[in-house]
Amino acid sequence: MAKPSVELTRELQDSIRRCLSQGAVLQQHHVKLETKPKKFEDRVLALTSWRLHLFLLKVPAKVESSFNVLEIRAFNTLSQNQILVETERGMVSMRLPSAESVDQVTRHVSSALSKVCPGPGCLIRRGNADTPEGPRDTSPNSETSTSTTHSVCGGFSETYAALCDYNGLHCREEVQWDVDTIYHAEDNREFNLLDFSHLESRDLALMVAALAYNQWFTKLYCKDLRLGSEVLEQVLHTLSKSGSLEELVLDNAGLKTDFVQKLAGVFGENGSCVLHALTLSHNPIEDKGFLSLSQQLLCFPSGLTKLCLAKTAISPRGLQALGQTFGANPAFASSLRYLDLSKNPGLLATDEANALYSFLAQPNALVHLDLSGTDCVIDLLLGALLHGCCSHLTYLNLARNSCSHRKGREAPPAFKQFFSSAYTLSHVNLSATKLPLEALRALLQGLSLNSHLSDLHLDLSSCELRSAGAQALQEQLGAVTCVGSLDLSDNGFDSDLLTLVPALGKNKSLKHLFLGKNFNVKAKTLEEILHKLVQLIQEEDCSLQSLSVADSRLKLRTSILINALGSNTCLAKVDLSGNGMEDIGAKMLSKALQINSSLRTILWDRNNTSALGFLDIARALESNHTLRFMSFPVSDISQAYRSAPERTEDVWQKIQWCLVRNNHSQTCPQEQAFRLQQGLVTSSAEQMLQRLCGRVQEEVRALRLCPLEPVQDELLYARDLIKDAKNSRALFPSLYELGHVLANDGPVRQRLESVASEVSKAVDKELQVILESMVSLTQELCPVAMRVAEGHNKMLSNVAERVTVPRNFIRGALLEQAGQDIQNKLDEVKLSVVTYLTSSIVDEILQELYHSHKSLARHLTQLRTLSDPPGCPGQGQDLSSRGRGRNHDHEETTDDELGTNIDTMAIKKQKRCRKIRPVSAFISGSPQDMESQLGNLGIPPGWFSGLGGSQPTASGSWEGLSELPTHGYKLRHQTQGRPRPPRTTPPGPGRPSMPAPGTRQENGMATRLDEGLEDFFSRRVLEESSSYPRTLRTVRPGLSEAPLPPLQKKRRRGLFHFRRPRSFKGDRGPGSPTTGLLLPPPPPPPPTQESPPSPDPPSLGNNSSPCWSPEEESSLLPGFGGGRGPSFRRKMGTEGSEPGEGGPAPGTAQQPRVHGVALPGLERAKGWSFDGKREGPGPDQEGSTQAWQKRRSSDDAGPGSWKPPPPPQSTKPSFSAMRRAEATWHIAEESAPNHSCQSPSPASQDGEEEKEGTLFPERTLPARNAKLQDPALAPWPPKPVAVPRGRQPPQEPGVREEAEAGDAAPGVNKPRLRLSSQQDQEEPEVQGPPDPGRRTAPLKPKRTRRAQSCDKLEPDRRRPPDPTGTSEPGTD
């Protein structure tokens, strides 16, 4: 600071400093101020950084006047130490005490002005030309220096402070600090108003005004911030003054409609304007402004490189003027690289767009072109681009436009020509454009012919491609090799994805795939699509790196895809957002992350994930060291935070910590990857190897004594194969251990250690050279200080200690960081090599073992055939059949259990299946999954629907399921094969007759009549039966033995759940005292020699089935059981009947039916088959079928068909009576007498059959069921059948006699039903009233029969049949 004048007292100086506390006082001079012409008064001149102050010579000091340096218009130095200052408010003339004081004031003002308005030369004009100017110091630290090269950010802070002082506003120090620190550290030349959006509009205006005098910043940026009028005025002022501002971005800044017109005028004023990038998007602009701007752009000598006018409401007229400007100014053809006219509807729909098309058709330098949402005609545009933009265009966005205005079916030629000729395209966006099928084909054909492009991103989302587009993609996409990223979201593919996904997998150049919003299908189809997708990403040569199924609403079935991510090695990024997979999906994702080592990025949100789901992810990331990025799930986190804030915050912090840890170089756990691959490679084929080795060993032992040389050679080869198979178990760990041992001291580590040593020496040498160079330069610039420092011995010794780099740091950087990354990659490659070698060897061993097994089995068969003795056809045939059966069993077991063809593809398929995590219980328990699983086992869909849809348990026998047909069933009623009484009415013409299923087996061969006869008479029914899977009570809820939940049981209670089965009501005599009382049947007579004990039917042949069939389920009257299936019956076993006794309780379960077994007393060719169906050719068979069809057609009639009137309400049994009947069942059973009748054969054999109770329910229950038939539903009575010899129907009235007669009839009588004319000849008919002891075939009831009263049935049984056919038939 200049020395103050001697006249100024100390007190006055301190008072002036206190008055100017806001700014530091740099100089104080005692001057003579000219107040009037030639009249001078004493004043004090105080100089601060940006202002000159005049004080009176009084204490306390008071400012008389002041002015800012920016107010100075002229500063003249006159003779006699006088200066004349011209300001905006007037002239100021003062006389200083000395020439030195004049020089100090002059330098101060010049320095301040140079900081605010930097420029060359002196800003002070000398009034006396004879007086030479003194020497000017131009050093960087001099006060008169005008150089701003070394100032921070071009002196923005000083300019801003001067402008604040000039406008009388407070200077924001935070603005100065941000610019001097942050902008300077980043070397950022873009001034972003968003960084100071928290300040007032006046502060923003001053900052923008400071840019007018600043040469550092070249870009002014403002987006999504509404600017006031003050700021916009300063923007225009800055553009009119600045010579360094090159780019202006005012995107959605709230510009007025006349701003562009003012901007055009500013461009005309500033001849030195260097602006070359202009962005005015999302601001309304009027046509007048566009016209003015177009006129000014004609004068731009260098044109514009970037012009963004998106969503500016530009009219076609303004576009026409703009296009003409582009064509008139030749600079635009070489300078314009970025053009954005998007979001202006109707802009290119008129003829005014031809001016723009003309510019685009000329050779130009466009790189980025965005015309989305402008209603442009794509084929016309591509025709223009074909001539002018093929060589430079990289980004093309034509979304939300129309393809062509023509309605022809021919593809526009421009599609194929342009996309086959483009050289540098990397992004093509055609989303929300309804592409015709031919246009899509032309597009794909053009890309397939283009050999210049690679890694092209093609966006075809929301194009409504649907099935036709999917078909075109399947046909054409395989030949397209330049597309690296394909977006097919929201195209309505749906079920077409079943064929499209495999087609996408054939394109090996595809790296990124987007398939969201295409899964609007049913659950079963959705699972099939997801399995196809899983199969795609599990292929060994899969090229996909990222997969997106965002916003597909997959819900819980997202886990099907997630389960395949665990062992996946190709995907690095996956997007699962918007699928609503909930916490279960998060848990499945956590399990996948625990073993995955390839995923780097996961995007997931909008999945209804709570804090518990995030906790599962956090725990999984503790063992995952490869995931680098996980998007912040805003929706799910906010929802979880509302319910559990503390837990959500802790869990997310843990997730972020794991991600930060994974972004640093570290050792990856290779042991985990080793164990995973070992399980996938070895476990997939180990069981198959064991089976094949066991089979081959058995064959080797059987053929070891064969003297044939070829056989011995094959035996030797087979032994070698078995040895290789045993050694292959240790192949994988041995190879991995070998690679691990060699890698510890391998050449890579040795080379890294040597490089670390060499780098340490090079670092020391470089530091030595740098130190010597710096010291020499310091000695040159400051020689005196260097001599003093060397004299004190401080310089070189202190610096040498600071420039040393520890060798441990270099070794750690190379070996622990870079070396560890190299080692991790090396371990991955090593593991892949081990996996490949092991898989190849195991595949070869399996293939050779399989061929050896086939060859040895063939030799064994030939030897057994030759060993049969001649002349013994029976024995030889038996031996041959045994040999064939054994060999056939070997071969069939191998083909079925080990795969129909043991080749490399089969092994790969099994390994791929093992890589995928099995479906969880919450998905597999669904009906859709059950149907699909049963379909894979050969069971038609819906087979278990009658049993409640429960899953089968593992305890049940599933052996019979393999014998069921694997093809689908036609939709037929479950009870269509139920026995029907003969009908004479012809069937309806609409339904074909179905053959009786009991006459043929499933393979189409005729059933043998004596099939299973020996087993039938040698096995027990209940206790000793091993193939009967379960009792009836365990079968009823489903095939599962677990009890049903209460809710499900409650739902199964129908309106008629309290009804008992009709078999319980049919045995009561006509004079029963209690309505609904059910008495048990008497036990059958003791067995005779002609009728041995009956065996267990399920063990007979291949026709037995351990499960309930639909026919068996439907054999009861609907409405009397409360639900489908035999749920009302009691358990079998000791509760219903004793093991040694024959008569089981009426609640005994209905056994599975046996096909093809002819019992004594019932000729197989003439009677009923044991599955309850008629068999045998003849007119009666056809008539029965026709009658049944007509009955079914009448039953299925619509609401308008005739129905019988229900019985009166008084005749219906009460619920309490039925409950009492059930409670007294066992008492009535014990009190029933035993009836023994010596009836001749075959009646005795039929009676013997009753010993086993409900072995064949369709033969024991008709007597009871017949009484429940509604008279209105039986048009004619069945034909009477002869009463067996030695048996008379009971005629005595009374309760006891009627009860005994009703109970004895089912237990003893086995009537011969009249089925054909041949049977009629053998058994003459006996005409007469129906016998209560006789039974007829059960009729399929209608649901209205449930109302039939038990009291009503008793007199009806004794009533003779009505010749009109309206009375109820008897019990036959």
From Swiss-Prot:
Positions of the UniProt region annotated as Necessary for localization at the cell membrane: 1040-1073
Annotated region described as Disordered, given as residue ranges: 126-151, 865-900, 970-1003, 1024-1372
LRR repeat segments: 244-264, 274-295, 303-323, 335-357, 365-385, 392-413, 424-444, 455-475, 482-501, 509-530
GO cellular component: cytoplasm; glutamatergic synapse; lamellipodium; plasma membrane; postsynapse
A GO biological process held by the record: cell migration
Alphabetical list of Gene3D superfamilies matching this protein: Pleckstrin-homology domain (PH domain)/Phosphotyrosine-binding domain (PTB) (2.30.29.30), Ribonuclease Inhibitor (3.80.10.10)
Start-end of Basic and acidic residues biased regions: 1163-1177, 1219-1229, 1348-1361
Compositionally skewed regions (Low complexity) per UniProt: 138-151, 1099-1109
Record bears the keyword Membrane: yes
Keywords, ordered alphabetically: Cell membrane, Cytoplasm, Leucine-rich repeat, Membrane, Repeat
Disulfide cysteine pairs (residue numbers): none
Compositionally biased intervals (Polar residues): 1233-1244
Compositional bias per record (Pro residues), positions renumbered to this chain: 982-995, 1079-1098
SUPFAM superfamilies found in the cross-reference section: RNI-like (SSF52047)
Expression by tissue: Widely expressed, with much higher levels in fetal tissues than in adult ones. Up-regulated in certain cancer tissues.
Skewed-composition ranges (Basic residues): 1048-1063
Alphabetical list of InterPro entries matching this protein: CARMIL_C (IPR031943), CARMIL_PH (IPR041245), Leu-rich_rpt (IPR001611), LRR_dom_sf (IPR032675), PH-like_dom_sf (IPR011993), PP1-Reg/Actin-Interact_Protein (IPR051279)
Domain of life, per lineage: Eukaryota
Record carries keyword Repeat: yes
Location of this chain's protein in the cell: Cytoplasm; Cell membrane
Family: Belongs to the CARMIL family.
PANTHER family given in the database record: CAPPING PROTEIN, ARP2_3 AND MYOSIN-I LINKER PROTEIN 3, LEUCINE-RICH REPEAT, ISOFORM F-RELATED
UniProt domain comment: The C-terminus is necessary for localization to the cell membrane.
Name of the molecule in the record: Capping protein, Arp2/3 and myosin-I linker protein 3
Biological source species: Homo sapiens (Human)
Gene name as annotated: CARMIL3
